[in-house]
Amino acid sequence: MQIRPYRPQQDYRAVLNAQCDLYKINFPRFVCTPAFLADQAQRLRAAAKRPFENGIFVLEDGLDFAGYVWVAIRMDLQGTYGSVDQVYLQDSYRRRGLGKLLMGAAHDFVTKQGIKVARLYVTAGNQDAVRLYEREGYAVTRLEMEKPLT
């Protein structure tokens, strides 16, 4: 297994195709449409053009794509932070401790820029991801609540 920086010409299709799976894991009623993929493609191309603001790292198993992590540098009223936006592993690579490797790549990207805080959002029902993030030292700082209005 090897983690390396994203190479647009080599990795674009694999990372883009993983978007549908990633969203289905987190949003069970999600339907992957051409419009969704077009939007994600635009985001991915834009991120690749700003390598100091976006770290995208690919996990390879030999020549096979196994997953990736996407972290962005952001700023709000509390200061600058690393936002771990996406962590994805193909199904056959899950529950093998590889998420920790991807998180390490994200954290390294952030700390090399002198930033001392990383944040992320996780869907409450994605308990595998919640456990990974808790093991990595993340703690709940805010709760987002929702009420369907009929």
Each language-model region and where it sits:
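A short helix-loop-beta-strand connector motif used in the catalytic cores of GNAT acetyltransferases and
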Residues: 45-58
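A short beta-loop-alpha structural element at the N-terminal edge
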Residues: 1-17, 28
